């Protein structure tokens, strides 16, 4: 009793065999030369010019209307869909109707890839179509696609379950074509940024992902082991220190688009693996970098959306430069009435208590201030806003402020209540840098597992001399969320990190036979999706009886049907 596959899966495998029996290879090795796309035909076809009279298109069959000796189907390629008109007499000129009557009508299915040779025309109803002279099977789909129906502008049976969409992104891209546009725009964001940097003579570089010391940010790293060297290594949490070593080495400006990894929480705006762009430019400071960042984001918005005026989470947000600038101290004072200037760790801890900000004993001054800011200020920063001049304890890699040594020359850009980028006038004093690293070590000893490691090679590089330099890092995933108005980071990642799929444990056959289910019916019931005896108790006996009989008949199982009373007994069993 073979019922491991659904009826559709069985039929498609039978079609696969039938194609081969007819001498048609369902997965041919030869290339198929495509001469036009659906969009090119839609954008450029002209009845008067009679262009596209000899085209070869290829794609996936997405719908069919079979009408005797002539039919229509929709072909979807990477640019969109186009209707194809196919007629038996055109593709079966020798009088043998097999190619149309058997192959097209019976052995091809929605989801199959085919190539079509023909010419473009408008049907009597004005629908742009390709008249098929010849088709070639390119790939047989043996698993049916979800069928999304549209009628009168309404969508039915849409493929919208986020859990399934993220796990099976390939399927999401097939049946939800608007999803592809998000990723096309993501690529445009990165291309525009590269163009912006390259025009200014900055060099794109690559730095190690496996690092002996995870530096450049305060975060918990992933740890791995190199068997040959017998050493632990870390997946990088930032590219910063290696890029600054290149500035030491004489590059005037370098940037990198790279994957970073942080072994921390997952939510709608955080994924443990994420894409970040970092850029470092010699002889610049954080004031210059603010203007540079404004110009870059203004250009990205125009390239991706054609305007700097966007809507994010229903709120109008403008990326037109210049952006607002506020100091962190003033922002906290404005929102809480508390002045963090010159406060000790004990005073800040007491302030957190008074302000009902949750902290723990491992927090130093920097994290205490960050906790206050995060709870009271971030969500209020809707329009693009530079928060500047952070307390020194929050920024171990940043240069002291030129007019206040308790502050640093740092800014973060906030948009829609979220941090988008982080930038410094980079610390280039090797003695000061070592002292900052040592302070991070003290925080680590207190239990702060996000404190920075001491990187003595980086200190050594600074000892050779690094020019005045400004650096900026920006999260590409979050930028894409803003530019495409997506509320979840999973919607801008092709394959976001997911928790393991929950595996439902089937009840043993004995549990079913104990309530009267015949042994031969147990695998059938479980194949129908009722994996536990408990699941039967939630069913309406009459409907379940009809479903059982229908499944038995459809799959030609030949089992003796139970009576309605027997089925009622299974559902009512305690």
Regions found by a protein language model. Name each.
Residues 501-574:
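Compact, charge-rich alpha-helical regulatory domains located at protein termini
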Residues 1-504:
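Class II aminoacyl-tRNA synthetase catalytic cores and aaRS-like
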């Amino acid at each position: 009793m073979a019922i491991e596959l659904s009826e559709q899966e069985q039929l498609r495998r039978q079609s696969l065999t039938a194609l081969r029996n007819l001498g048609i290879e369902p997965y041919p090795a030869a290339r198929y030369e495509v001469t036009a796309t659906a969009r090119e035909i839609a954008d450029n076809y002209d009845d008067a010019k009679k262009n596209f009279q000899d085209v070869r298109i290829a794609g996936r069959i997405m719908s069919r209307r079979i009408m005797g000796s002539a039919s229509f189907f929709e072909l979807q390629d990477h640019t969109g869909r186009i209707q194809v008109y196919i007629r038996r007499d055109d593709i079966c000129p020798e009088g043998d109707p097999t190619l149309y009557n058997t192959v097209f009508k019976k052995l091809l299915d929605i989801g199959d890839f085919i190539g079509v040779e023909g010419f473009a025309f408008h049907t009597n109803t004005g629908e742009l179509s390709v008249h098929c002279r010849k088709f070639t099977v390119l790939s047989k789909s043996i698993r049916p696609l979800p069928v999304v129906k549209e009628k009168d502008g309404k969508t039915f049976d849409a493929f919208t379950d986020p859990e399934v969409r993220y796990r099976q992104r390939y399927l999401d891209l097939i049946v939800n074509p608007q999803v592809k546009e998000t990723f096309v725009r993501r690529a445009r964001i990165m291309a525009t940024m590269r163009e912006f940097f390259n025009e200014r003579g900055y060099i794109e570089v690559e730095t190690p992902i496996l690092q002996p010391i995870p530096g450049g940010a305060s975060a918990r790293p992933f740890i791995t082991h190199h068997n040959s060297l017998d050493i632990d290594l870390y997946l990088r949490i930032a590219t910063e220190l290696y890029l600054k070593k290149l500035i030491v080495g004489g590059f005037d400006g370098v940037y990198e688009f790279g994957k970073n990894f942080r072994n921390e929480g997952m939510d709608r705006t955080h994924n443990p693996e994420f894409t970040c762009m970092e850029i470092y430019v010699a002889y610049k400071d954080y004031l210059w970098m603010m203007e540079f960042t404004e110009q870059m984001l203004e250009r990205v918005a125009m390239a991706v959306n054609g305007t700097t005026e966007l809507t994010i989470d229903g709120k109008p947000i403008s990326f037109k430069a210049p952006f607002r600038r506020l100091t962190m101290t003033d922002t906290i004072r404005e929102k809480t009435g508390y002045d963090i200037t010159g406060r000790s760790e004990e005073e800040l801890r007491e302030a957190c208590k008074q302000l009902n900000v949750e902290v723990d004993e491992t927090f130093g001054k920097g994290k205490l201030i960050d906790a206050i800011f995060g709870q009271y200020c971030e969500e209020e920063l809707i329009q693009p806003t530079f928060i500047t001049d952070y307390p020194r304890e929050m920024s171990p890699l940043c240069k002291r402020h030129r007019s206040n040594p308790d502050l640093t020359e740092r800014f973060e850009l906030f948009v829609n209540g979220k941090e988008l980028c982080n930038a410094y006038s980079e610390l280039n004093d090797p003695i000061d840098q070592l002292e900052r690293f040592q302070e991070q070590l003290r925080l680590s000893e207190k239990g702060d597992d996000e404190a920075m490691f001491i990187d003595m090679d980086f200190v050594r590089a600074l000892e050779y001399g690094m020019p005045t330099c400004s650096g900026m890092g920006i999260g590409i995933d979050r930028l894409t969320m803003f530019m495409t108005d997506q509320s979840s980071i999973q919607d801008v990642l092709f394959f976001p990190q997911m928790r393991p799929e929950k595996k439902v444990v089937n009840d043993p056959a004995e549990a079913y036979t104990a309530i009267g289910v015949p042994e031969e019916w147990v695998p059938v019931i479980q194949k129908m999706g009722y994996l536990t005896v408990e699941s039967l108790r939630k069913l309406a006996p009459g409907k379940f009886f009809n479903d059982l009989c229908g499944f038995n008949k459809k799959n030609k199982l030949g089992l003796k049907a139970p009576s309605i009373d027997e089925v009622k007994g299974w559902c009512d069993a305690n």
